[in-house]
Amino acid sequence: MSNQLNTMDIKEILKFLPHRYPFLLIDRVLDFTPGETLHAIKNVTINEPFFQGHFPVQPVMPGVLILEAMAQATGLLAFKTMSEEPSNDALYYFAGIDKARFKRVVEPGDQLHFEVQMIKERRGIGVFTGVAKVDGEVVCSAEIMCARREISK
């Protein structure tokens, strides 16, 4: 059995996710096991555009963007699980969220770690659990659904 990690750098992430600045919220995948789990990171800096208005005196990353980053991690795991190469023909869309909970704020200088796990997949809809952590402390948890959809041209 190999201890080699499956990683993705930003160049590979850009091949799988359609998001671009300022909405690409995954910087690196540290490890993944198709059909099971994926561990990704987001380095949160003061240069993030959302900090200009949320909030100028006490910058806090919006919770919806933490959830969006978690959804992007599930999309990467879905692609890797289906052994699907990126193309312009299909995307995995954020389809739903349940049981979202926020435990603490995320501030400039934090490194968010996303741990997502595939629970089930049926007819192109995947159900995942996700946890976001900073320094090992849970920031946010949720159950996320994503759906594969053909792109109409």
Swiss-Prot record:
GO terms for cellular component: cytoplasm; membrane. SUPFAM superfamilies: Thioesterase/thiol ester dehydrase-isomerase (SSF54637). InterPro entries: FabA_FabZ (IPR013114), FabZ (IPR010084), HotDog_dom_sf (IPR029069). It is an enzyme of class 4 (lyase). It catalyses: a (3R)-hydroxyacyl-[ACP] = a (2E)-enoyl-[ACP] + H2O. GO terms for biological process: fatty acid biosynthetic process; lipid A biosynthetic process. Its EC number is 4.2.1.59. Involved in unsaturated fatty acids biosynthesis. Catalyzes the dehydration of short chain beta-hydroxyacyl-ACPs and long chain saturated and unsaturated beta-hydroxyacyl-ACPs. PANTHER family: 3-HYDROXYACYL-[ACYL-CARRIER-PROTEIN] DEHYDRATASE. This is 3-hydroxyacyl-[acyl-carrier-protein] dehydratase FabZ. The lineage of its organism: Bacteria, Pseudomonadati, Pseudomonadota, Gammaproteobacteria, Alteromonadales.
